[in-house]
Amino acid sequence: MVSTEEAINHSGLDLEKIDKLRVGVIWGSGIGGIETFQNQMLDHASGDGTPRFNPFFIPKMIADITPGYISMKYGFMGPNYTTVSACASSANAMVDALNYIRLGYCDVIVTGLSLIHI
């Protein structure tokens, strides 16, 4: 989040004047939450069979949490998703961002990469 905030501040974007419907967030994630998923499955398998999961299981596991949080923080209402394609994730996110702008669907796309093993 710190790098996103710095990027937006350095961009010169006037958040009061832009059309937030035309600002999207496309993020890349090489992998996210796999350790969380593994731990939950092991806990479930070694338990009594009752399907109990940590309430943070989904938020810690899904790769799309980052662009969602960025969009909510800044009120961006354009395209919002994560590309997951191993080492090419950030490149795919940047190409998607370029195409949204090039084709006239958006004026601004915030793009980046997160690689988290939690």
Residue ranges with predicted function:
Residues 9-19, 27-116:
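Acyl-thioester C-C bond-transforming condensing/cleaving domain
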Residues 1-6, 15:
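N-terminal amphipathic, basic-rich helices that act as targeting or association modules
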